[in-house]
Amino acid sequence: MTAKKLENNSNHAVTAEEVKILTDLLDESTRHLVGDEEFAKIKGLVKIAASSDHSQLESQIACLSNQEMIIVARYFATLPLLINITEDVDLATEVNLLNNTDKDYLGKLESTVDLVAEKDNAAEILSHVNVVPVLTAHPTQVQRKTILELTNKIHDQLRRHRDVKASTINRKEWTNQLRRYIEIIMQTDIIREKKLKVSNEIKNVMVYYPGSLIPAITKLTARYKELAREKGLNVDGATPITMGMWIGGDRDGNPYVTAETLRLSATIQSEVIFEYYVKALNDLYRTVSVSTSYVQPTPEVAELAKLSADNSPFRENEPYRRAFYYLESRLAHTEMELLDVFSKEAVVKKEAALKAPVYKDAYEFKKDLEAIKRSLIQNHDRAVTGGHFDALLEAIDVFGFHLATIDMRQDSSVNEACVAELLKSARICDNYSDLDEEEKIQILLSELNNDPRSLHSSNSPKSELLQRELKIYHTARLLKDTLGENVIKQHIISHTESISDMLEQAIMLKEYGLLDSEKARVQVVPLFETVEDLQNSREIMKRYLSFDIVKRWVASKGNYQEIMLGYSDSNKDGGYLASCWNLYKAQTELTAIGEEQGIKITFMHGRGGTVGRGGGPSYEAITSQPFGSIKDRIRTTEQGEIIQNKYGNKDAAYYNLEMLVSAAVDRMVSKQKVSQDHIQDFTASMDGIVEDSNRVYRELVFDNPHFHDYFFQATPIKEVSSLNIGSRPAARKKITELSGLRAIPWVFSWSQSRVMFPGWYGVGSAFKHFIDADPNNLKELQEMYQGWPFFHSLLSNVDMVLSKSNMEIAEKYADLCEDEATRSVFDIIKKEWELTKEVILQIEGHSKLLEDNPSLERSLDYRLPYFNVLNYVQLEMIKRGRQEKLSGIYESIIHITINGVASGLRNSG
């Protein structure tokens, strides 16, 4: 029997009860805040929204004053937020329940290990699996940290309600706690008044580690190894999950990311993991009170105890406690020394710590702990070494002293400018940027192969750009020398279009010894983003990997070469189908090149939260990758509101990480459901379908003279761009140019206007054309849907996006257009939407959208009426703002509605 998605097991009755409790408390808090008269207007809107009478909703909202708009916006923005919490609690409860039973669900670790155990090389497979979620700070997390903390408190209260019998909880006290948090939310600024700095983004994402990610990852890693041992497989060195980080190192298009932010990111991360280790040692110190009156420690532990500064007479017979004290002193001294290297402030040094020697690395720290564990086991205290003790050992393997690996990223054009300046300064080439590709390659290879010296010198004049870039590489070298090799492992090149783009990056790394002619301490990782670049990636990588120097770099990295794939720009460039298909083909071709050259090509997937940016259910996203494309390792970006949704509490974090690992392993070992001949037939069909889709998409986006104005007039792009939700600018160029607009605000704006354009446009016409060409083609598409994971996932995502779109509301945004010619673009969009819905249901064999996703259907039924209200408030305020100059209250209301719609959709950018 096929395992079901865990979300489909949800307890709808309890969730509905909790939604009612929270809604009643919100009503009560709002009435006290605004009075009976104003509250009656809000409840009137609730009633109209539930009836789906959009015309009445629009007319009622148009009658509200600006001051009334604030209250209405706050109320309806808070409702979907509270619904989200109840659903998150339901998922967390279900995860906890099923992990303590024998019941199966899609992605459960036990089933995954059972599947692998049948293979002859099972131990090798499980030992090398490594899935890396990379946390990023793209501007899609619209919730303030303050609001997130309050919603987490409500989450905890609801968990209490579920974890104990309802009859045993103090209902009055419990309800008062919930009431208190909701009242505070209603009186707290829901949006940021100041734009975030990079330092804020670093600190914001760190909150997910102590209470969520660290316990979830250590638990999952321990469970992974335990399940393998039960099958007779030794995978003790496995790290199925490690974490990545872009914040502080991703300077592509963000002038605020500097050497200082890179240093700050590494330092804060290090502080977080040291704090965890110290707390864990304190816990062990308190609990492991084993006395020499009963058992004797090994000589190793006796020596650790002897070195301890814990000379209390009460600890005389407790060697383990004294040993833990010594380890904590060594750890404290180690952290002090690291902070001394990076901190500009004086570090307060404790005398006890100074007497203990510094750990040279995390492995040395682990060796001391393992000595204590061996002693306890020798004395038959095996139970003592489980739980927190084993969790600490797992944490050291996963997090070291660095916590997460920081990626560096820069645009290829910046690298070229810097290399051109370096070559000119070193009197090697005065006109590097004017050379053709072949000439560039020869100069770069000569420098990399033959001259170990840096091109720059300390006293040579440098542009501001080059100075800033060199400081970053210098800091990266310092971080690796201090915190270990894993703190920074790769440098990604945005807009990689040529071999020289990668060799230029190598030159920059060489300047501070991060790469030489024999090895690469930091790997050069190309990022292929546009449809054209994806199509060219095969030939670029084939030649790049043929260079002897590159082969040596790859060999120094364990024979792995990572390639990053960009989902956002390829979608904006060619539409959803063209993006998905070219990404799929690129992976297939690049994997084959790696196999030809004896290299394991691994992929980093630059996904966003929305389908238009590569988002969608994680399990399906990974299991729909081409067969053979996952070689042990896979990395994927997690950003914005997706981080909160997936990792906001330890149960949800465990489940989502478990899904990632299970999906990766499943794709590595499962067999294709359809024959290779069928896949080849499907591939040929897809080539033609995608060509049609790309043509339809580009005809509207790039060839229609009115599309540009439509986008800027019929979506809240200007309002979205002014949101204080990230440190990075919304556009590379002027905000009035589509070409310079970043993919994130592009997608975000279409989400707000409920068109969801990037997730489906061009799909309907392409499939319709294919079906009309041959009566048998519909059957082929249905076979593709049933037997090809890639195609099934693609259609399911389109189905989901269509269900979240709303053409009635989208048409109201179209009415914002200043002339009929511009507004006519909506007629094209609506016609394509209707066609896409019709064809998708035909291929799926369904009678309605979300027919095979009942949990999402119920979720949208809860929330859609409420954030429909927010859309009409947003529309009215945009109209008022464009007709007359309004005070700051206008922007505040708009931003509250943007926040609420994003919360309701749950994957807005």
UniProtKB/Swiss-Prot annotation:
The active site is at H138, K572. It catalyses: oxaloacetate + phosphate = phosphoenolpyruvate + hydrogencarbonate. Pfam families: PEPcase. GO terms for biological process: carbon fixation; oxaloacetate metabolic process; tricarboxylic acid cycle. It comes from the Bacteria. InterPro entries: PEP_COase (IPR021135), PEP_COase_bac/pln-type (IPR022805), PEP_COase_Lys_AS (IPR018129), PEPCASE_His_AS (IPR033129), Pyrv/PenolPyrv_kinase-like_dom (IPR015813). One of its GO terms (molecular function) is magnesium ion binding. PROSITE patterns: PEPCASE_1, PEPCASE_2. Its cofactor is Mg(2+). Keywords: Carbon dioxide fixation, Lyase, Magnesium. GO terms for cellular component: cytosol. Belongs to the PEPCase type 1 family. This is Phosphoenolpyruvate carboxylase. It comes from Lactobacillus delbrueckii subsp. bulgaricus (strain ATCC 11842 / DSM 20081 / BCRC 10696 / JCM 1002 / NBRC 13953 / NCIMB 11778 / NCTC 12712 / WDCM 00102 / Lb 14). The lineage of its organism: Bacteria, Bacillati, Bacillota, Bacilli, Lactobacillales.
